[in-house]
Design a protein with these regions (language model features):
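C-terminal alpha-helical interaction module
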Residues: 1-410
Length: 410
């Protein structure tokens, strides 16, 4: 994208951050300039006071009773808010397996080529982080991977069977680890390591094929260990890549803090909320954080979060942004604005990563993404209908939605 076009997009972005002029996703400059944070919160408050569902106010006794009926249901693996939790807040589970692959002498898990396997889901943004860094660092021959089927049922993530024809993608295969031939679900991997495991059966899972145990199931830690742990064995072009550089560590950690809470996890806290108050609070925080991210990109000039250096922040933010318009806008009700028409710089940033870096594009599978959310979360979408749009899932680099085109010509 040329300099003039980038400058024009920055101008549009600056205008958007200063004003959100209507009750719908809006692109353009209003006569009154208000801060985006204030606008988000005032807008949510006004909706809360007026919204009705089927002619019934969301805060009416009838609607409160309906909410009570929902929380009295028995707990299931697909209950994202614990039944009986009156807060309505989604609370993410802390990962249980936290060992590291290490180059230290005598390490329990040394960096041996071919020893480790990565279980992922193309649908899962947390797992996608690990696939991205694996490809960026040229670790394809060092760590094998396989993807589960996109569907999550009562037993959690399932492995595809040879008969499955609805989950196309690289390495979407039955469990390939020796000894796991009869496994049908990722839960069996967890139980093989700890028969008493009582947590969620999440991905990614970094598995040691030599000792038949789980090394780590925390995506941020897997990302960080793969950043350097195999460098001694890699060609120079890959070994030199550092996504957690010393001069930027403090800034990276600061960004991780609010991006994780407000955006990465914010979409889930909005979408899985079971009370209006929890939804209002979290969706407002989400869009405040998106506004902050848009402002940051305007200040830095791109193409990456820290200007011309690709870091962990980009690897962790991208999976959420690429899912935003296809899924989170409609499925998680994150619909104050979308990315492609409401955030010009975040839109450009996401497309730059996708179209210019195979590690980002090749690990994005829109079929798995859209089908998983819309057909697994039956408490949100009971008929499992998958919307056709947006079309396309991601726009080409130099194409804009009509509203942005109009803004660029002003």
């Amino acid at each position: 994208m040329n300099t003039a076009r980038s400058s024009a997009l920055s101008t549009v972005a600056s205008s958007l951050l200063l004003s959100r002029s209507t009750r719908f996703t809006s692109l353009f400059i209003s006569s009154k300039r208000r801060s985006s944070t204030s606008w988000n919160r005032k807008y949510i408050t006004s909706l809360r006071n007026t919204t009705q569902i089927g002619g019934v106010s969301v805060n009416s006794p009838l609607n409160v009773a309906r909410q009570g009926q929902q929380v009295r249901m028995a707990s299931k693996i697909t209950d994202w808010v614990k039944p009986g939790d009156s807060s309505g807040e989604f609370k993410r589970q802390v990962s249980s397996f936290r060992d590291w692959i290490s180059k230290e002498p005598g390490a329990k898990f040394p960096p041996e080529k071919g020893r480790y396997h990565l279980y992922v889901s193309y649908a899962c943004p947390w797992a996608t982080r690990t696939l991205i860094v694996r490809k960026l660092k040229g670790l394809e021959d060092f760590i094998s991977f396989s993807s589960v089927h996109w569907h999550m049922g009562e037993k959690g993530w399932c492995f595809p069977t040879p008969e499955d024809t609805d989950a196309a993608g690289e390495n979407v295969i039955p469990d390939p680890v020796p000894g796991h031939e009869k496994y049908t679900h990722i839960r069996e991997v967890y139980f093989s390591v700890d028969p008493n495991y009582g947590g969620r059966f999440t991905v990614p899972v970094l598995f040691d094929k030599k000792t038949n145990t789980i090394v780590n199931n925390e995506s941020s830690e897997i990302l960080r260990m793969l950043n350097h742990v195999f460098d001694d064995q890699l060609p120079a072009e890959y070994a030199k890549l550092d996504f957690y550089p010393e001069p930027l560590k403090t800034q990276i950690e600061e960004a991780h803090g609010w991006i994780y809470d407000g955006i990465n996890n914010g979409v889930y806290k909005s979408g899985f909320a079971t009370t209006q108050e929890a939804y209002d609070r979290n969706v407002t925080t989400l869009f405040d954080a998106l506004d902050k991210a848009e402002k940051h990109l305007a200040e830095m000039g791109g193409p990456y979060w820290f200007g011309d250096q690709l870091t962990e922040v980009d690897i962790r933010l991208f999976p959420t942004l690429i899912r935003f318009d296809p899924v989170y806008v409609q499925h998680f009700k994150c619909n104050l604005r979308d990315i492609r028409s409401g955030y010009p710089l975040l839109h450009k940033y996401t497309r730059d990563l996708y179209w210019k870096h195979p590690a980002f594009k090749d690990t994005t599978n829109f079929l798995h993404i859209k089908n998983h959310y819309t057909r697994s979360h039956t408490q949100i979408n009971p008929h499992s209908i998958t919307p056709l749009g947006p079309v396309p899932d991601i726009l080409p680099l130099d194409e804009e939605v009509n509203a942005v085109k109009a803004a660029l010509t002003k």
